[in-house]
Amino acid sequence: MTGARAYVVFCHPTRDSLVGAALDRTIAGLEASGHEVRVSDLYAEGFEPAFTADDLAHHRVDHREHPELRADIATYIEHLGWCDTLVLVHPTWWSGQPAMLKGWIDRVFVSGVAWTFPDGAVRLHPALTNVRRIVAVTTHGSSKFVNALQGESGKRIMTRSIRTMCHRRCRTDWIALYGVDRCTDAERRAFLDRVEHRLSRR
């Protein structure tokens, strides 16, 4: 396979963090497997996550046909259409994605970009059929057992909601460090090694 393209979305307020280190290892793994990599750092770029009344008013308008509606999200849309692998690097807070990343999904996965709703249809039709793999690289404060009891809503958003807008054979990969609040330095290092190893494989 040649010409693999990975779009990495990083969401953490502090670049100098464990999640920031995971971003570095994510990029290293992807590049080792021959991917061309693009990265968006949502906090550093000052992304506006609030889904506004104007966003709602144009929610079902095909954004491919109305570029004026997407001026502030155009770069993200272009990256989504370019990639075959989407990687989300973020902490898990309150069982889900940080508000910044959830807002990115709300505002960027719009009509004509992530989905279409043709006349007479009873469900959304996927538009991100170029995406054949979705990966989350994340940390959880609590143990895997506690997260399982809480339902892991963030994981379900990726594996059930986002995935259905992608290629019908799209693979998902959840690379997580659980119990990060009490883990050792050795466990953190092992997690970072695992991130790079998993991303170095196709």
Question: Model regions: which residues?
Answer:
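Glycine-rich phosphate/pyrophosphate-binding loop and the adjoining helix
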Residues: 145-149, 153-202
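Short beta-strands and strand-loop turn motifs
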Residues: 9-10, 137-138, 176
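Short, glycine-/small-residue-rich phosphate/pyrophosphate-handling segment
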Residues: 116-164
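Short histidine/acidic/glycine/proline-rich micro-motifs that form metal-
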Residues: 13-16, 92, 141-145, 179-182
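Structural motif
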Residues: 1, 78, 126-129, 167
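Active-site donor-binding loop signature of nucleotide-sugar glycosyltransferases
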Residues: 42, 139, 177-179
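A structural motif corresponding to the C-terminal end of an alpha-helix
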Residues: 83, 89, 129-130, 162-170
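N-terminal beta1-alpha1-beta2 submodule of the flavodoxin-like/Rossmannoid cofactor-binding fold
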Residues: 1-113, 186, 190-202
